[in-house]
């Protein structure tokens, strides 16, 4: 049963339970929230209990070790009804996400770090981080992206500096790239890019070419 949005919490830890769903009117949050924990549960969708338009931005929200994406979708409602997440760091690692959670960015979520390691993504197509024309409101805030331990074979042009001008750290290690994904390399703020251990389904090392001019990026 929900507390209701009249109840405003400063902290919430629901880790290590058997929770399958969190209703939209579960509760509200104060402007002093640092971190919220929903890890190690059975959530199939990203809960719609936040609001990206809030003037208050929480420190972090952790949805790791759930079943998000297992039904083929990341959210249970329509995009018109989804409100995003007003948090700087969003952790979605160890789920069953097959499609990049574009919903978070389309709603203007002010995310600076997104952790999507250990999921089931094979590609991140164009218009996952931006619409066909222009950019979403707050995608430029994204500085750190963790995509390790997926099954990615390519990145789209969404990962260029025109969409992510402040990207500083990105890790695509333990994926399936056979060619170097150069898109993030034109970010003037990029400090670290990890691409270790690229193998195919049989375990063969498949990344063999070093991109020309990478030392001058």
Name these PLM-found stretches:
Residues 1, 22, 46, 71-72, ...:
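Canonical leucine-rich repeat
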Residues 4-8, 28-32, 52-57, 82-86, ...:
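Leucine-rich repeat
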Residues 9, 19, 32-33, 43, ...:
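Conserved hydrophobic position(s) of the canonical leucine-rich repeat
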Residues 10-14, 34-38, 58-63, 88-92, ...:
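Conserved hydrophobic beta-strand positions in leucine-rich repeat
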Residues 14-17, 41, 66, 95, ...:
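Consensus "Asn ladder" position of solenoid repeat domains
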Residues 36, 61, 168-217:
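Leucine-rich solenoid repeat scaffolds
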Residues 66-78, 131-135:
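Acidic/polar low-complexity surface segments
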């Amino acid at each position: 049963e929900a507390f209701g949005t009249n109840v405003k919490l400063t902290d919430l830890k629901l880790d290590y339970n058997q929770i399958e769903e969190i209703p939209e009117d579960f509760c509200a949050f104060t402007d002093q929230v640092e971190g919220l924990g929903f890890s190690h549960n059975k959530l199939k969708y990203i809960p719609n209990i936040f609001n990206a338009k809030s003037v208050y931005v929480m420190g972090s929200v952790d949805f790791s070790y759930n079943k998000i994406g297992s039904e083929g979708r990341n959210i249970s409602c329509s995009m018109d009804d989804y409100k995003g997440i007003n948090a700087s760091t969003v952790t979605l690692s160890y789920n069953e996400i097959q499609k990049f959670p574009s919903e978070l960015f389309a709603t203007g979520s002010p995310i600076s770090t997104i952790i999507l390691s250990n999921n089931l993504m094979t590609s991140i197509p164009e218009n996952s981080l931006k619409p066909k024309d222009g950019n979403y409101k707050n995608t430029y805030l994204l500085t750190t992206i963790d995509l390790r331990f997926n099954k990615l074979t390519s990145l789209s042009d969404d990962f260029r500096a025109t969409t992510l001008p402040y990207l500083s750290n990105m890790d695509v290690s333990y994926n399936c790239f056979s060619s170097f994904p150069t898109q993030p390399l034109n970010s003037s703020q990029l400090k670290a890019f990890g691409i270790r251990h690229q193998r195919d389904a049989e375990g063969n090392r498949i990344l063999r070419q070093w991109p020309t001019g990478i030392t001058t990026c």
